[in-house]
């Protein structure tokens, strides 16, 4: 055995094949065996005689024959051979074998294990010399026979064989030290063949050694082992030091180095080396070892640590010693053989190992290299001598010396300005001024560079990427200079793709899209600016720092694969848990779907009683008879049945047995019985009778030592790692569950009270048995999807169920051939049509019409009836249960009022959109919940968890409603969503946040000062936003307004989802497993439940937010305080009847107003025709709508909200009114047009026509080119208004004329001929269409139409003087609030014009005067004053003046009372007082109009209070809506037959508005009439009657509250009435004294006259709706009537009328707009409803019914009939009180009092106030009135409705902020 000098060295030794004989004088043979028994002397013998005797020494020497001494023999022989036998060394340095050599092949037996390791290590190393023949040598031919049997040698790598060599060998400076076994492993079959030379001798390298004489004198031990010290303890580590015989641990680390690149060494080198070897050997001492030089680094094994830390190499490139052994047995495959060029290699027939493939190259003839080199050197030397330059210097081969780069240097830009620079070089060199790029910006744009320098993108060098193979590889060796004279045969390279190579693009890079190619994207800008803030946020721990990801090196899970984790990962939890067996065996009747258990048809009653069967009466049997019935105990029967079953089981051989085989086995009279109470009212899936369920006990082990699952009375224990429920089990927790193919549901065992027992009732009698246990079943986790109504699955089930029924009928048939009747099937399936049944029957049977089987369906002879197993497979019991669940839920929805279309199952692709739109009731249907749950379990979506589908309704269950996986679109109601553009301009707008405040916020958030100083403004803002968002998410943070949405990542969203699921799961477990006896008081129990939920959420918040319990309790107390405060405020304004609304309001307002992305759910209670209530839920997601709703709900009262809800109908009424107004305008316009037509067109001046139009203009009227439709040259210019002369269609001549005008004949571009094609111009086709269209129009002149009735103006002489200046008919009534505001604003303007008032014009600037707002708490200025005026905040002068005084007080406080600014403010106040005094009368009237309670008329105040009572109290009674309006005759036809005098609240309000009630008694009579009518029609026990009684009670109660005030008003009214009567009597005595009703001569109605009636005139108001007085007039009634009939309704002709109108009162003038505003009459009606007290505003009406009569005349009988029918008068209380009326005051605005009476007067209805009566100067004819009535209903009704609509529209406007009224509550 050979000992290498070091373990990794490749030192070579020259072996000798001669060994000297032992020298007898040396003391015997040198034996290593002596080492085993003591020290050895210099001769190699044991020292001393004391240890062993001679006999033992002889035995030891005999052991040497076993080969222990052969090591020394080999070593010494090696050196001697070099000295004595140098001539035997052949050309290549190896030793020739001798014929007399002895074979010592058994020397390896001593250290066999070591040699094996050694051979593997040496085989993995490469020799120093790179010879192609290296692998062809064999080092040990003696062992070849044995080793070849054990391990067949692999095929050799390709390489040329040198024929001129006699023996094989390998040449090198040093011979590689390799063992025999290693060389064999490296040797192929060809090498083995070559190893036997021509003469049949073994010519292997070691053969010579073995055949040499081994009896030579051995050297001394000290020569062999320099560390040996005689007489001392042997130091084996030094003797056999490291590397001497140490096995190599990393034996195969470098096996991947291929040997194919070794180059053959030239002959001359070989010869030189031979000589040097011989010289060295001769000079060496025999025992001087020739150690190898230190090996180069690439040949050394790497350190263990480096190897461990290095990146993992591919499994294929890394091989171990074990794999080597396996691979050696297989034929080797060249790596390149099966690469991309495999096809070509297959075509060329290249073998797998690639041997012999040479590309067709030929080796060159070996020429002595020195000769070549000499020739080259001589040439170069000659050149050097001639030039005097060293051409072979290293500098000459640098790139810098090879290129003429100096020529490309631009010394002066002017020189190259005209030249075009090379684009590639120009882009790398940077900007140079040229004609194309005059400046750097233009250059950057041209190059496509981004202008920003701080772009956060990967940095790239401007220079091309270095190719490492070109720089560092020996690529020049692979250049083929001559294919016929190759220095070596090239091997095909192996294609390797380096993922680190930047030239390779192995995947599509993830680049952010840029908006434009030239401008940097917004994202990049954001990233660059937010980089610093991100670093800071990472430091403060708000966001996690993102790890630097290297895209080219994906992270490896487990580089060393130490743990095999991937084999231990738990399986993803699917739908059906794989915990234990889940084979459910139903009873035989259930599997066969037998009738009573699986009904074929269920009617509505059965469906409503689904799984809740009522006790039915028996028609026969013992229980059908009355009388006492005995109750039988079942104890004996149970034991008897158990014994029978046990005997049956024993008889069948023991083991498990299935007993549920017949319907009788399914009785509850025997066996064990448990009760299960389902917590869900209507579970999504329920089992039918006879279906089986397993009880499973899920147990999660504790970590570490687990005691095991606790024993349970029922069920099998299943150990689960992942939870089969939505929440996970805690370690050590056991949860029992029902599990079957339909659902899995947790169950909770409860002890049955001892007092409870079970009664079983059959036809025969009653039976009693004990109950032991009861389970509460939690919420189901569906495993089976319920089909949707009319879905494909549902229809398929119906079809299959019918088919199965038919098959079973055939099986039951005893006839041959089998036959059944259609009637049997129809009886079972009454809902199926006969055609559908026939369709199923035709598949398997034929209908026989004659013969024995007539009217029977007979089974087809060729049809095979399915077997029982096949029938069972067609329809499973689970499918039936799902179908029953679907139809039961469908019935429930139908009962709730949902139509069939509302709960169709959606298509899969539109499902998520569909989920958002369907109603909540439908969303909870089982087909939706089961589909959602199953999809969520498959990971397709998430569940809403809390919401409408929660079966408990109190947050203790899961809501199975789909929401998307990603945190977009809809989320939980509690999670805020970002809504765009809602913070712009508000104080939450981050752009308005100053830097100082932002930094202050950061300090509050705990950011260090030094970090804040480093940030720029927008980085500070970014940190504020991020930290605010983070705190808002966790529920903290006072500055939540700066939070921006809930931009959760998907991972965060999933985490929150899991947490919420776990919370509800734990809560459900806690509640359902609780053994507390719950109180019957539902309120307290629900409060406790909410406490549980709140505790759970508090704990969760404490964990999430790191808040202490004291902080949480403080926050909760604060919330409760605010809630209490809000409730107290609400209680002040709302009545007791509104309390049910508070919860709604609270739930609405509890939504965080600053949070975005809210979802508002409004639950509305409706009542159907039968009086049954049902609830519907509306979901609102628009933030603007939510805000408006919340604001109205919190600030407005019920009356307002009711009107607000009814706005749609009122809006429609307004539209009708608007339509009438527009029709009136059109009528007037038409008349004006007709007048213009009569005048005729003006004469045209003849002008020269241009031959060709200059411009390419096209007329829109006639289509001609060269002019526009407004041009007078257009032939149709004057025809637009005038009717055409032809009465009907155009003649042909006219059409031709039209064509000439439309198309110019000389326009050659209209038609083009291109080859065989004719191209028609677009203009030609358009003009042809125009001609065709115009020719089809039929035109009739106005003169030929039937004449319309025209209103004739009065022609009487005595009326001529009544002509007055023209005024518009539609005089706009002005809101008194607007008038007041305009007066106040004019006063403000006057004050602004005062000198030196500038400091008071705008608010004080806090930056300029820093301490102002600390001193002044209520600042005020003229600008704020003006804004308040425009907002209608001042209904009276006092409030306005109070705010103005505040300016003076503030100035005195801050500047001092004597300061000049205070004096200026005082002058402003003085001016204001002066102006207010000037307009005192007008302002007083306006204030009264605004606030009726300020009115002098007691009747108005009395009516005002009564109306308040009706609207705010009586109408607010819950469910009082049937009494709000008159009963609809369409819906209740017989009502008016039963009820003679109907009454309702709306009618009462109308009576109030007409001031019909002067006392409470008359008011209460009508209120009591409502109750009396209800009793009469509905009965005293009706719910309606109870509601009516409640209305009456509320009325009496409220009247009692106002008793004192109403009593005083009644007295005042009575006094006024008496005074008026007295005055009337006095006036009747003196007929010449003009009274209010004395007919006045026409000349009294002078323009300057202003007539007014005292307020006491109202006492004449008639109670009998007959308020029209017959007052004689100068104008006869007959004449007026005639005028009315002849009128044409033309309102523009009023100036021609002869009836002069009397002047209105002062108030009327005040409320009318100025003449300048009359022009805005088109918009007038929009504001007509602004004033609920606008009855006093007696301008002309905007509706047709408001058109007045010519003068005062009695009402026509037709109108009176209408009035009687409508229950109201046609006039609308045309009472004028001087200074009366006006708007409701601000304080009463919310009450929304609707005064129908305060409307425009009807001029036809002449009440006591004659001063305003005759206003219109014309009449509406009866015909027109009839026409209008047909179009818009009776005029009276439209007016009344209009008045209410106007009020409500005003209210609505006030909410929206568009009204003139005050909207700031």
Swiss-Prot record:
The modification Phosphoserine is found at residues 131, 302, 1664, 1667, 1773, 1776, 1794, 1821. There is a cross-link at residues 544, 557 (Glycyl lysine isopeptide (Lys-Gly) (interchain with G-Cter in SUMO2)). The keyword DNA repair does not apply. The keyword NAD does not apply. It catalyses: L-seryl-[protein] + ATP = O-phospho-L-seryl-[protein] + ADP + H(+); L-threonyl-[protein] + ATP = O-phospho-L-threonyl-[protein] + ADP + H(+); L-lysyl-[protein] + acetyl-CoA = N(6)-acetyl-L-lysyl-[protein] + CoA + H(+). This is Transcription initiation factor TFIID subunit 1. It comes from Mesocricetus auratus (Golden hamster). Residues 1646-1682, 1804-1814, 1832-1841 have a biased composition (Polar residues).
């Amino acid at each position: 055995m050979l000992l290498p000098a070091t373990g990794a060295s490749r030192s070579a030794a020259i072996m000798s094949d001669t060994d000297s004989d032992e020298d007898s004088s040396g003391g015997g043979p040198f034996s290593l065996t002596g080492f085993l028994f003591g020290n050895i002397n210099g001769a190699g013998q044991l020292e001393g005689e004391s240890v062993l005797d001679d006999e033992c020494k002889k035995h030891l020497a005999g052991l040497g024959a076993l080969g222990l001494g052969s090591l020394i023999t080999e070593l010494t022989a090696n050196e001697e051979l070099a000295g004595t036998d140098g001539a035997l060394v052949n050309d290549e340095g190896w030793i020739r074998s001798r014929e007399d050599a002895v074979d010592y092949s058994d020397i390896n037996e001593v250290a066999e294990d070591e040699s094996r390791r050694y051979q593997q290590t040496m085989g993995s190393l490469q020799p120093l010399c790179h010879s192609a023949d290296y692998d062809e040598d064999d080092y040990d031919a003696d062992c070849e026979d044995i080793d070849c049997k054990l391990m067949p040698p692999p095929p050799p790598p390709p390489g040329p064989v040198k024929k001129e060599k006699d023996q094989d060998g390998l040449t090198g400076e040093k011979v590689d030290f390799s063992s025999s076994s290693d060389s064999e492993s490296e040797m192929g079959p060809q090498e083995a063949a070559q190893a036997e030379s021509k003469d049949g001798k073994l010519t292997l390298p070691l053969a010579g050694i073995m055949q040499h004489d081994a009896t030579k004198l051995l050297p001394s031990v000290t020569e062999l082992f320099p560390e040996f010290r005689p007489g001392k303890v042997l130091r084996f580590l030094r003797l056999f030091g490291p590397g001497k015989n140490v096995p190599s641990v990393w034996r195969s680390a470098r096996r991947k180095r291929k040997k194919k690149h070794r180059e053959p060494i030239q002959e001359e080198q070989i010869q030189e080396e031979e000589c040097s070897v011989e010289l060295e050997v001769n000079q060496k001492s025999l025992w001087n070892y020739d150690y190898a030089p230190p090996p180069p680094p690439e040949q050394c094994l790497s350190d263990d640590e480096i190897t461990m830390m290095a990146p993992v190499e591919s499994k294929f490139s890394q091989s171990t010693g074990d794999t080597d052994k396996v691979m050696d047995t297989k034929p080797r495959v060249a790596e390149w053989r099966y690469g991309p060029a495999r096809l070509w290699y297959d075509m060329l027939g290249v073998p797998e190992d690639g041997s012999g493939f040479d590309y067709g190259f030929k080796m060159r003839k070996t020429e002595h290299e020195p000769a070549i080199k000499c020739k080259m050197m001589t040439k170069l030397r000659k050149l050097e001598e001639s030039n005097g330059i060293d051409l072979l210097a290293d500098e000459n081969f640098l790139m810098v010396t090879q290129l003429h780069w100096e020529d490309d240097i631009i010394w002066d830009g002017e020189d190259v300005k005209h030249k075009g620079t090379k684009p590639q070089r120009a882009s790398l060199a940077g900007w140079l001024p040229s004609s194309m790029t005059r400046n750097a910006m233009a250059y950057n744009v041209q190059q496509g560079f981004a202008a920003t320098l701080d772009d956060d993108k990967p940095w790239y060098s401007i220079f091309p990427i270095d190719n490492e193979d070109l720089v560092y590889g020996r690529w020049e060796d692979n250049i083929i200079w001559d294919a016929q004279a190759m220095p070596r045969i090239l091997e095909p390279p192996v294609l390797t793709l380096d993922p680190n190579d930047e030239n390779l693009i192995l995947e599509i890079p993830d680049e952010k899209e840029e908006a434009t190619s030239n401008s940097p994207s917004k994202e990049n800008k954001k990233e660059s600016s937010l980089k610093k803030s991100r670093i800071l946020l990472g430091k403060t721990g708000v966001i996690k720092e993102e790890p630097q990801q290297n895209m080219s090196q994906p992270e490896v899970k487990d580089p060393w694969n130490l743990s095999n984790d991937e084999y231990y990962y738990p399986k993803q939890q699917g739908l059906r848990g794989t915990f234990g067996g889940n084979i459910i065996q139903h009873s035989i009747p259930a599997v066969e779907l037998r009738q009573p258990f699986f009904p074929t048809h269920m009617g509505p009653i059965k469906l409503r009683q689904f799984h809740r069967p009522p006790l039915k009466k028996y028609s026969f049997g013992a229980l059908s008879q009355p009388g006492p019935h005995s109750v039988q105990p079942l104890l004996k029967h149970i034991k008897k049945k158990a014994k029978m079953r046990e005997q049956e089981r024993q008889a069948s051989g023991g083991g498990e047995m299935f007993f549920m085989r017949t319907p009788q086995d399914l009785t509850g009279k025997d066996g064990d019985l448990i009760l299960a109470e389902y917590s869900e009212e209507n579970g999504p899936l329920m089992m039918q009778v006879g279906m089986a369920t397993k009880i499973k006990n899920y147990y999660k082990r504790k970590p570490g030592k687990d005691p095991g699952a606790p024993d349970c009375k029922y069920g099998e224990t299943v150990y689960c790692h992942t939870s089969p429920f939505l929440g996970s089990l805690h370690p050590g927790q056991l949860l029992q569950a029902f599990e079957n193919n339909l659902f899995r549901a947790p169950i909770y065992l409860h002890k049955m009270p001892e007092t409870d027992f079970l009664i079983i009732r059959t036809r025969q009698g009653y039976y009693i048995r004990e109950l032991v246990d009861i389970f509460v079943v939690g919420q189901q986790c569906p495993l089976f999807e319920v089909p949707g109504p009319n879905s494909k699955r549902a229809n398929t089930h119906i079809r299959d169920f019918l088919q199965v029924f038919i098959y079973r009928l055939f099986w039951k048939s005893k006839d041959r051939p089998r036959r059944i009747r259609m009637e049997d099937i129809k009886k079972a399936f009454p809902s199926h049509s006969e055609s559908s049944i026939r369709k199923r029957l035709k598949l398997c049977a034929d209908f026989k019409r004659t013969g024995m089987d007539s009217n029977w369906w007979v089974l087809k002879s060729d049809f095979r009836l399915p077997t029982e197993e096949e029938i069972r497979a067609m329809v499973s019991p689970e499918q039936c249960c799902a179908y029953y669940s679907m139809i039961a839920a469908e019935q429930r929805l139908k009962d709730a009022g949902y139509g069939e279309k509302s709960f169709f199952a959606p298509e899969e692709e539109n499902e998520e959109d569909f989920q958002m739109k369907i109603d909540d009731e439908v969303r909870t249907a089982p087909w939706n919940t089961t589909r959602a749950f199953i999809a969520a379990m498959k990971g397709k979506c998430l569940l809403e968890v809390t919401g409408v589908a929660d079966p408990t309704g109190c947050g203790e269950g899961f809501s199975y409603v789909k929401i998307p996986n990603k945190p977009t679109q809809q989320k939980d109601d509690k999670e805020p969503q970002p809504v765009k553009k809602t913070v712009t301009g508000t104080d939450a707008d981050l752009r308005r946040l100053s830097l100082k405040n932002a930094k202050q916020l950061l300090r509050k958030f705990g950011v260090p000062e030094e970090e804040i100083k480093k940030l720029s403004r927008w980085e500070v803002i970014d940190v504020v936003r991020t930290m605010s968002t983070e705190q808002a998410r966790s529920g903290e943070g006072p500055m939540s307004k700066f939070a921006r949405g809930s931009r959760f990542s998907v991972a965060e969203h999933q985490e929150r989802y899991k947490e919420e699921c776990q919370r509800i799961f734990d809560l459900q477990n806690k509640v359902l497993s609780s053994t507390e006896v719950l109180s019957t008081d539902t309120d307290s129990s629900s409060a406790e439940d909410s406490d549980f939920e709140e505790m759970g959420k508090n704990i969760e918040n404490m964990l999430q937010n790191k808040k202490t319990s004291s902080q949480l309790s403080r926050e909760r107390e604060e919330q409760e305080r605010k809630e209490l405060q809000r409730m107290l405020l609400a209680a002040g304004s709302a009545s007791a009847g509104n309390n049910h609304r508070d919860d709604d309001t609270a739930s609405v307002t509890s939504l965080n107003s600053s949070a975005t992305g809210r979802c508002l759910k409004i639950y509305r209670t409706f009542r159907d025709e039968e009086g049954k209530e049902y609830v519907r839920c509306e979901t609102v997601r628009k933030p603007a709508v939510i805000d408006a709703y919340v604001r109205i709900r919190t600030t407005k009262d019920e009356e307002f909200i009711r009107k607000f809800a009814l706005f749609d109908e009122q809006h429609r009424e307004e539209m009708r009114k608007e339509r009438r107004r527009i029709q009136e305008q059109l009528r007037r316009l038409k008349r004006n047009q007709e007048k213009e037509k009569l005048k005729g067109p003006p004469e045209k001046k003849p002008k020269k026509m241009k031959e060709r139009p200059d411009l390419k203009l096209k007329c829109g009227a006639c289509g001609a080119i060269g002019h526009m439709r407004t041009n007078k040259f257009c032939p149709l210019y004057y025809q637009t208004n005038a009717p055409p002369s032809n009465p009907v269609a155009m003649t042909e001549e006219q059409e031709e004329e039209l064509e000439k005008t439309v198309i110019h004949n000389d326009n050659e571009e209209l038609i083009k001929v291109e080859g065989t094609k004719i191209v028609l111009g677009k203009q030609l086709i358009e003009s042809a269409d125009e001609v065709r269209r115009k020719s089809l129009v039929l035109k009739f002149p106005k003169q030929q139409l039937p004449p319309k009735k025209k209103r004739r103006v009065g022609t009487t002489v005595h009326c001529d003087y009544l002509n007055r200046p023209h005024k518009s008919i539609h005089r706009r009534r002005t809101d008194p609030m607007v008038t007041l505001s305009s007066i106040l604003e004019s006063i403000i303007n006057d004050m602004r014009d005062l000198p030196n008032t500038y400091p008071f014009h705008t608010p004080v600037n806090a930056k300029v005067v820093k301490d102002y707002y600390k001193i002044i708490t209520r600042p005020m200025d003229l600008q704020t004053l003006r804004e308040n005026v425009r907002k209608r905040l001042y209904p009276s002068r006092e409030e306005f003046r109070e705010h103005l005084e505040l300016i003076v007080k503030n100035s005195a406080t801050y500047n001092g009372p004597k300061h000049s600014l205070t004096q200026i403010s005082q002058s402003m106040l003085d001016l204001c007082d002066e102006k207010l005094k000037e307009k005192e009368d007008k302002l007083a009237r306006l204030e009264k109009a605004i606030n009726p309670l300020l009115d002098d008329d007691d009747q108005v105040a009395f009516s005002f209070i009564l109306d308040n009572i009706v609207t705010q109290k009586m109408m607010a009674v819950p469910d009082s809506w049937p009494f709000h309006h008159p009963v609809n005759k369409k819906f209740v036809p017989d009502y008016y037959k039963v009820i003679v005098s109907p009454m309702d609240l709306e009618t009462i309000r109308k009576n109030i508005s007409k001031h019909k009630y002067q006392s409470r008694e008359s008011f209460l009579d009508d209120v009591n009439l409502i109750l009396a009518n209800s009793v009469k029609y509905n009965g005293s026990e009706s719910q309606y009657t109870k509601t009516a009684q409640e209305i009456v009670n509320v009325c009496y109660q409220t009247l009692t509250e106002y008793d004192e005030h109403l009593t005083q008003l009644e007295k005042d009214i009575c006094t006024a009435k008496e005074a008026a009567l007295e005055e009337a009597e006095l006036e009747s005595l003196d007929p010449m004294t003009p009274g209010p009703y004395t007919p006045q001569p026409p000349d009294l109605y002078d323009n300057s006259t202003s007539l007014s009636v005292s307020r006491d005139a109202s006492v004449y108001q008639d109670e009998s709706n007959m308020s029209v007085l017959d007052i004689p007039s100068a104008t006869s009634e007959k004449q007026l009537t005639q005028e009315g009939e002849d009128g044409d309704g033309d309102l523009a002709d009023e100036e021609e009328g002869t009836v002069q109108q009397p002047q209105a009162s002062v108030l009327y003038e005040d409320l009318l707009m100025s003449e300048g505003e009359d022009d805005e009459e088109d918009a007038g009606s929009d504001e007509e409803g602004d004033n609920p007290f606008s009855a006093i505003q007696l301008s002309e009406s905007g509706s047709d019914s408001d058109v007045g009569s010519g003068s005062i005349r009695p009402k026509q009988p037709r109108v009176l009939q209408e009035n009687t029918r409508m229950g109201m008068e046609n006039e609308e209380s045309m009472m004028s009180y001087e200074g009366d009326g006006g708007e409701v005051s601000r304080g009463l605005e919310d009450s929304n009092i609707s005064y129908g009476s305060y409307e425009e007067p009807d001029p036809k209805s002449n009440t006591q106030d004659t001063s305003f009566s005759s206003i219109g100067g014309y009449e509406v004819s009866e015909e027109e009135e009839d026409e209008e009535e047909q179009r818009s209903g009776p005029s009276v009704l439209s007016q009344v409705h209009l008045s209410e609509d106007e009020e409500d529209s005003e209210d609505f406007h006030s909410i929206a902020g568009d009204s003139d009224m005050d909207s700031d509550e």
